Amino acid sequence: MKTCLLTVAASSLFFALSALYAQTPSSGSEATLTANPVYTKNCAKCHGKTAEGRHFAGPSLASPKAAAMSADDLRSMIANGKGHMPKFAAKLKPEEIDALVQQILVINKK
């Protein structure tokens, strides 16, 4: 009986913590970015499906660091890369980069 109760308690704790740490978009702006097929194909692998960031792979796009960047800074980062961020100038059209920039700015309410 104790084993059963311990299993139920551990499972309950696991699910409670999973729900606590689950990251879902806090507003429609993240959903707009992550619904963009260009984002899904080129960005989500490192920045996460909901732009939450993926530890060492890529930072959150809804963060103080991203919020501090101007549209030109974001555009340059996407086009030219920096550090572990690959270059996308040859892979994406300028209007696709601009759409990503605008959506990142919206997430950060600029």
Each language-model region and where it sits:
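Short Fe-S-cluster ligation motifs
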Residues: 72-88
